[in-house]
Amino acid sequence: MNPLKDRISEAVLKSIENIGTVGIDLPIRIEYSRDEKFGDYACTIAMDREWRSAAAAVHPEFTNPRKFAEAIVKSLQSAKGYAELFDSAEIAGPGFINLRLTPSLLEACTREAVREGTGYGRTARSQPKSIIFEFVSANPTGPLNIVSARSAALGDSCCNLLEAAGDRVHREYYVNDYGNQVDLLGRSCLLRMLESEGAKLKFAIKDHKGDYSYPAGPGLPFPPEGYHGEYLIEIVQLILGENPGLKPPADVIRRAKELSKRSDNAGDPIEQLELASLADDLGKRATEYFLSTHKLDLSRFRVRFDGFYSERSLHESHEVLAAKDRLGERVFTDGEGKILFRSTDYGDDKDRVIVRDDGRPTYLLADIAYHYTKIKRKFDRIYNIWGPDHHGYIARLAGAMQAMGYPSEDFRVLIAQQVNLLEDGKPVVMSKRTGKFITMKTLIEEIPIDVTRYFFVMRSFEAHLDFDFNLARDTSEKNPYYYVAYAHARIRSIFRKAAERGLIPAEAVGRPELLLELKSSPIEMTEERRRLYWLVARLPEEVRDAADSIEPHRIVNYLYSLATALSRFYAPTENRIIDQEPSTAVSLLILLGGVAACLKNGLGLLGMEAPERMTREEV
C-alpha cells in the first residue's frame, strides 16, 4: 500500500489538472493538521506563491489563494474516487485545505497492517538510490565511548529506515589506523610496558593557558597528548601474552629503569632507548586489538556494518598522495613549499594544506582519498555522521567532493551533537586520553540495549542529548522506552486473554492475520478508536519521511504518540475487549493487532525489541 500522503498528493494533482492547470512541475506539500478537529491532513498548495503564479498563467484569478483553494476543492470533490479517499475537504482561513480520510480507508489500512505483519511500514521506490552511509569511525586507540555509541545508534537506525523506504544502503566504518594518533598510542603502550617492568613515569600538567609542563622529580616523560588511561596496562599485557618476543631485552629494561630515576631527563625516552620501531609495532597491534573490540561491542549493540575501510591501506597503495591530482586546478603550492587546496572557492574560511612542506600528506588529503573511493564505487548518495568537533571540517571536504565532480546535493554530513551524561543530576566528565570515560561496553552492561538505543535516537542530530542514568535505570513508564514497550506487551496480553476466554482461536495469538478470516462486526468510530486507526495508517509515510529527512527521532515521536493514543483507547469501558461479543471483539482485536504491528516494526527499525510479556500487564 502506498503511503497516504502519496495518494493524497496524486488526488490533489489530478484535481488541479482537471481545472485546466497542467504541466506544472512543482512539489505538493501535504502536512498533518496542527489541530485534528479540522482534519487529518492539510494541503498548503494554494498558499504557495510558486503554485499560484504558475496556475494564474491559465486562470488569473488564482493569484488569490482562497479562489485557488476553492477551485481545487470543487474539482477534488467531483473527481471519481473522492468518496473512497476523503470524508471531507474544506477550506480554512485564506486558503488552507483541510482533508479528512474516510473510516473505511483507515480500517483498510489497519487490516493491511495486520496482514503484512513485520513487513508493514516498508515501501518501494520507483527510483531507489544506492547510498553509502559512514558512521562511528572512531579512532581505534581505546574502547568505544558513549559518544560513539550514540553515533552507532543513530547511524544504524538511519540505514534501517532508508532500506525500509526502498533504498540500497552500504554501511561503512572508516578505520583511522594511520598517523599521529596511532604513533601516540604505540608510545603510550611502550611506556606502560616499561612501567610494568619497574620504570617510573611522570605525566605533564596543563596550566590555565593550555601549556604543558612536567613536575619536578624522576620519571620517564609521558607524551602530553598520549593516552593516559590505565586500560592500556591490560592491553599491553594481552599483547605480550600473545607475542612474548616483543618484550625489550633485559639490558634495555635496566637502562629504562635507570633513566626513570633521573630528575633532569627531559628528552624522549623512546628515542634514547632506541625503541621507536617497537613503539610503531605496538601501535599497530593495539589498534588491531581495539578495532576487534569495537566490532564486538557494536555487534552486541545490534549495529551492523557491511565494510571496514582502512586508512592505512590508502597510504600503502599510494592513493593518498595521488588524491591531490583529483582536485584539478584547485590546488597550488605556496612560498614555503606546502601544497594547498583552494577550499575558499567552496565557502571555507581559508585554503587548506593537503601536503606539508616535507612532503607528508595531511589528514585532509587522506580523507579526500577515502571519499574518492566512495565516488569510484558509484554511490548515488554519500552520507557521513561526524562528531560535534568536526563541524568546521564540513566545508573543506564538501568542497573537495565538488572539485572531484560529485554533486553537492548528494553529499551530506550529519553532526551528532554531544552527549551529556547525568548521574544523580550531576554531569559525568569524560576523556579518552585521561582514561576517565564510560565505555560503550560498560554502558550496555549496565543499561538495557533497548533503553540505550531509545535514548540515543529520541532527539534530533543537532540537539544535545542529556543521558540521565537514573531515568535509564527506571523500569516504570517514566522511562520513555518502557512506556512504548508496555503498550506492545499489553496488547499481546489482551490477545492471550481473549484466546483464554474463547473469543479468538489460540493460533491467532501468534498469527494475528488469522483474525481477518473470522466474523467481525462494524464498530462505532469513536474519537479514541479513530485516532488509533489513523496512526496505524500513517506508519508507511512516517518511515518514508523519516528516511528522506534522515531523522530517526521522528519514529520515536510517532511511537510515543501511538502508545499515548492506545492508553486513551483503554479508558472507555466500551473498549474493554474481553467483555464484548466475539464478532465485536474480533474487530477491536484487528485494530489492536495493527497497533501492535506498528509498535513492533517501528521499534525494530530503531534496533529495539518489542517485548511479548512484561511484569506490568493490564487487560
Residues of each region from the PLM?
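Non-catalytic interaction-recognition regions
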Residues: 2-107, 115-118, 122-619
